[in-house]
Every structure is written in structure tokens, then in C-alpha cells.
Amino acid sequence: MRGKSFFFVVLLLVFCVAGVNAKRIVRVLAIGNSFSEDAVEHYLYELAAAQGDSLVIGNAYIPGCPLDRHWDNALTGKKAYRYRKIVGGVTTTQKNTDLATIVRDDEWDVITLQQASHYSGLPYTYSHLVQLKDYVRKICRNGKVEVMWHLTWAYAQNSKHSAFRYYKHDQQIWSQSEE
């Protein structure tokens, strides 16, 4: 259910941006996977521009990447990320980039973290969330950065995704596990 995931993040970020004077540029970095790609790259920029806000959007992503892998990459400096940055509507892309370089690339106002969709309702898969959050806060050039959670919602009830078995192919079980 990419639509719900995207909607939640966009809604949250738009509220965050809405209170900001339009003359200020708000810098948002997503650390995630293909769901973050959809949410921040395909929708957020246009929504903010429509209300007169200016954004710099960064997306550090690895398709299907779980939190534990993001944490391992932070510890090892592995150059595993595709990093896309949108400034003034122009997108630049860097491949094989490490997380520290991306986080230090700008004075991010907001950094979102995201679990791989299929693990989002499994609490034991969040073992390194606090460390990852503390890590990005520590190395971000903006000492007042807000770290937010990008919640991935349950797959469609008729999903054939193999990981849906973790939730007995039931959206309700998945959604309740995220509460």
C-alpha cells in the first residue's frame, strides 16, 4: 500500500513545512527505500511548491533496505546508497555513496527514517532504530534537525508479496502490530 505510506509521510512533512515562512528553504532528507523514493521525490516537492514553500529534498535509498542494513552501512561507511537531491526542481544523482556523506551534504531540517515495508510491523526488526537516529542527529550539520519516522502501511489485502506471510496475509494484524 504505497499510497497510504506516501500519504502519511507527505501529510506529516507538509504540516512541518506549512508553518515555515515561504521565504525559508526547508531541507528534507529521507533515509529509506523505494517507498521513500515515491513519497519524497514524486509528491512532496510539488505539494510544497503548490503552497508557496521552497524545499531541498534528499533521498538516500537502497531498494528494500531494512533499518539494520542502514545501521550496518553507517557503522562501516559502506558506499551502498543512491543519493538523489532536488534543488530548485533540478535533480542530481550520485551512486555508491555512503550515509555519512549524504547526511553531511546539507543542513537538513528534517531527516526521515524508514523500515523496509515487509518488516514494518515486526518490532524485533527495530533493534537499531535508536542508534541510527542518534547517529544522524550527531553528524547532521544542523544541530536542530528533526528526525521523523516514515511509517510504511500494510500491503493490500490481496497482496501476493511473499513477506505478507509474516502477518498471516491480514492487513489488520499488520496494522495492529505497528501500534
Predicted regions, residues:
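Conserved SGNH/GDSL esterase-like catalytic core that processes O-acyl groups on lipids
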Residues: 26, 38-129, 156
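N-terminal secretory signal peptides that target proteins for export/translocation
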Residues: 1-3
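Alpha-helical cap/lid subdomain in secreted, periplasmic
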Residues: 96-179
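Sec-dependent N-terminal signal peptides
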Residues: 5-16
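Boundary at the C-terminal end of the N-terminal hydrophobic targeting segment
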Residues: 20-24
